[in-house]
Amino acid sequence: MKPGGFWLHLTLLGASLPAALGWMDPGTSRGPDVGVGESQAEEPRSFEVTRREGLSSHNELLASCGKKFCSRGSRCVLSRKTGEPECQCLEACRPSYVPVCGSDGRFYENHCKLHRAACLLGKRITVIHSKDCFLKGDTCTMAGYARLKNVLLALQTRLQPLQEGDSRQDPASQKRLLVESLFRDLDADGNGHLSSSELAQHVLKKQDLDEDLLGCSPGDLLRFDDYNSDSSLTLREFYMAFQVVQLSLAPEDRVSVTTVTVGLSTVLTCAVHGDLRPPIIWKRNGLTLNFLDLEDINDFGEDDSLYITKVTTIHMGNYTCHASGHEQLFQTHVLQVNVPPVIRVYPESQAQEPGVAASLRCHAEGIPMPRITWLKNGVDVSTQMSKQLSLLANGSELHISSVRYEDTGAYTCIAKNEVGVDEDISSLFIEDSARKTLANILWREEGLSVGNMFYVFSDDGIIVIHPVDCEIQRHLKPTEKIFMSYEEICPQREKNATQPCQWVSAVNVRNRYIYVAQPALSRVLVVDIQAQKVLQSIGVDPLPAKLSYDKSHDQVWVLSWGDVHKSRPSLQVITEASTGQSQHLIRTPFAGVDDFFIPPTNLIINHIRFGFIFNKSDPAVHKVDLETMMPLKTIGLHHHGCVPQAMAHTHLGGYFFIQCRQDSPASAARQLLVDSVTDSVLGPNGDVTGTPHTSPDGRFIVSAAADSPWLHVQEITVRGEIQTLYDLQINSGISDLAFQRSFTESNQYNIYAALHTEPDLLFLELSTGKVGMLKNLKEPPAGPAQPWGGTHRIMRDSGLFGQYLLTPARESLFLINGRQNTLRCEVSGIKGGTTVVWVGEV
């Protein structure tokens, strides 16, 4: 080496030695745990600013920082304001993975990042030789991450307040401007991407924080919201992280009406649009559907549409959709369900003598309401109208005032609406008495002798009453024998002692058999309607108190109390009930049953899958599978403090109405609403109280109680909405009520209600609210109630086409003519007739 070159190298070494010593002061000297790569990463960056400022600045920095000692994670720089040397936290560390645990409980990728974090936070963080933070993983939770983002926006608002013009914008636009401002501040190199190093530079100092961030830092933005996993955040991803979206919904799309035919599938698509739109949330009656495991709403598709696999009338109603986190902008979908007509005619066949009046009736149900037309032997009868022939109740009844031989024929009722048509035939034969055929004689004398009757279970056995003639057609005395066992119907406990029969509940099984409970004898009798005999007795658990027929599965459910204190209740099921003889008695697994409810069928809904059980003092209803007799789920009512007492159901909109037990004698028995689609409690049914009763077509809900002077009438619209028609105040509470089809207007109903303390009957026309009273009835049954419950004064109707109703008095029965709204007759000498069944055509 040349002598000059030697002295030059020596001079440079001497100039750089103080700077080198400045980085190795005792307070900052590196121990053996510091990687070589880290020191190399920190030192070159110490001169990053001075390189840009030229050689003179470089020499000045070397001279000034030579005596300035900076701790790890920082470097010496000249202050632009004062020109004096100062320590500044490192902007970044060279990427390397030598993980360590900090004394703050956090995990760091290397020592440099630990020291840099200590510098930025202004607190001491040392290396802990423990594996706890490795096992614990990242401590930043979703809750902490949400709090972090709120803090970032709050600090940004403090650092860069919105301008006057911006502050007048809506909150969503203000938030968008704030997030854009934060993004620009974080994007140090201005390339439109936030890297981990840029996010790491934005460390929140302790003095800026009003709340704990639960182990989160700005670097966690990459962990949670780097959707394309490219280790950087674009403005679009930054928008999504802070839920900044610009959503739109056209005014004409705010309410969308979708009409679908029952049994088909349908798709509801949300019209809320916008860049970066979050996932769509669907709700029904305020309950989120997306996360429920529903049988018929189970696929939301790639475009977040709502897919209903098989639409039924319970699905009708309102559905709303909105982008997650933006509930203020929502679309309402009104789902209307159309149902093709279903009709019944009455009678299917009749024979009349010339000169008498004849009526042919047709009942049709469907959505929209079907239109009815009549054909006689294929010809439209509307072209043959005369004084003799007329159409009543919007065409639902064809009336011939005086029949002639030429009126003989097949009369076809046709019901039609927008989605279908149905028809059935009612035949009319005109023959004088001398020309009666054997078939007509049998139809008149045999068929009518067992069908279209009230079967009354009284103190003196079983009494069959024909309402047209007001006569007792058949009387099965208590001493008559049971066909299969030869026991007496009502055995006497002591000789020469007359003891009344005791009945509590009876059901009609397909107009073939009547099942009736005898609580004191712990058995159920099976009455053969055609043979007019008691066929057999079925022994059940002690004190059977309630029977219910599940037509869909041909089962009779029997609730027994065990004793009068209901201390050992049980629920049994008699299968194959319509066979009359080959039944099986099955014990269900349910314990502590206080009551149960099986929804009724109707023309549109002919299959019921589920029933409901109430347990004593339990604020819940338990849903059971009627086929397997196994529990499915529990619908809790404890949030509403409701112990269920009674239930009703309408298939229109799928509502269950639950009557709660009274909290005190002075309080009213309020009601709750349950949605059968989601099995969720919707809340109180307004101010409605009392026991709910649903009309046969599911359109009207009438609520009343024996201890309340109020009667509430509600209607379900074709859109599945519950509307209160009116509330009536009456002088006495309602003991029981029955629905009667209107004879003046098709698809309308009236009710007849037995007053609790007065002998009168209340008549109400549901469509108009017109009220009347039927007087001159005798006092209702008196005395203490039976130990197994039940009302003293019942009301029983006579089926879909019947015009008669029955209610008991103390020692007689009263028959009401619903067509004429008058008292038909009184049948005397019948005591204890509070268990009654109507039997239609046999």
Curated annotation (Swiss-Prot):
InterPro entries: EF-hand-dom_pair, EF_Hand_1_Ca_BS, EF_hand_dom, Ig-like_dom, Ig-like_dom_sf, Ig-like_fold, Ig_sub, Ig_sub2. It comes from the Eukaryota. GO terms for cellular component: extracellular region; secretory granule. GO terms for biological process: cell differentiation; negative regulation of brain-derived neurotrophic factor receptor signaling pathway; negative regulation of collateral sprouting; negative regulation of dendritic spine development; regulation of BMP signaling pathway. Residues 174-209 form the EF-hand domain. It is found in: Secreted. Ca(2+) binds at residues 187, 189, 191, 193, 198. Residues 251-338, 341-426 form the Ig-like domain. Disulfide bonds join 87-119, 93-112, 101-133, 270-321, 362-413. Glycans are attached at residue 318. Its main location: secreted. Residues 81-135 form the Kazal-like domain. Keywords: Calcium, Disulfide bond, Glycoprotein, Immunoglobulin domain, Metal-binding, Repeat, Secreted, Signal. The gene is FSTL4. The keyword Secreted applies. GO terms for molecular function: brain-derived neurotrophic factor binding; calcium ion binding. This is Follistatin-related protein 4. Residues 1-22 form the signal peptide.
